[in-house]
Amino acid sequence: IPGRPESIGVQTKNLSNRKKNKKIEKKYSLVLKSLLQGCSILKKSKCKFIVIPCNTAHYWYDDLIKKIKLPIINMPKEVFIHTKKTCKKTSSIGLLATEGTLNTGVYNKFFDKSYKLIFPNINLQKNSVNKAIKFVKMGNVKAASKIIKPAINYLIKKRCKKIILGCTELPIAIFAFKSIKKVKSSKIFLDPNLILANAAMKKYSK
C-alpha cells in the first residue's frame, strides 16, 4: 500500500509528540485508520504479505501488525539488515529524509544500537533536503538534483559509510540524470524502496 500520511492531509512533522497532545493523537489515529483500510483490502484480495513503500508510514507499523493478521515487511528493518552486511558496527550512517521520518525515529529504532545515524543540520534540512523533495513532487527533477548536493556533501564530510535515501523522491533527485553505470557505482547510497522490493521478491519466492 502507498501509505503516505500526507495523502489524507496529515502532516507528520510533530507526530512524535502524539502522547502529549490530543490533537496529534487524533491525527495519528486518522492515519492508522486509513492504513488499516488499505491493509484490509489487500488481505481480502488474499495477498501473502504487505509492503509499505513509505518511510514515515512505518511509524504505524507496530499498531498495524497488532490489528492485521498478515505479515508486513518492515522497510527500515530491511535497510538495517542490508547495512549490517556491508558496514562495521559503530560506523556513521547518513540519513536523508523528511522531517516526519527523522522526528518519528523509524530508523533510529534499528540503527541506534549498532550505528551512529547522522542527519543534515537544520539549515540543510530546510534548504536542501526539504526543497529537493518538493521539487521532485513538482516535477522539477533537475532543480532537485542540484539542491540536494550540499546535504550529501555534508554527510560525506561527516565520514558516513552509507547514506540512506529515506524518502521516495530522493533516489529520483540523485539518480535521474546519471547513467546506469554511474548509478551502479554509487555504492554509498542505500535506496530503501529498492531494498524493500528485493526483500519482497525473496519472500514471495519462498
Q: Residue spans of the language-model regions?
A:
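Non-catalytic structural scaffold of enzyme domains
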Residues: 1-206
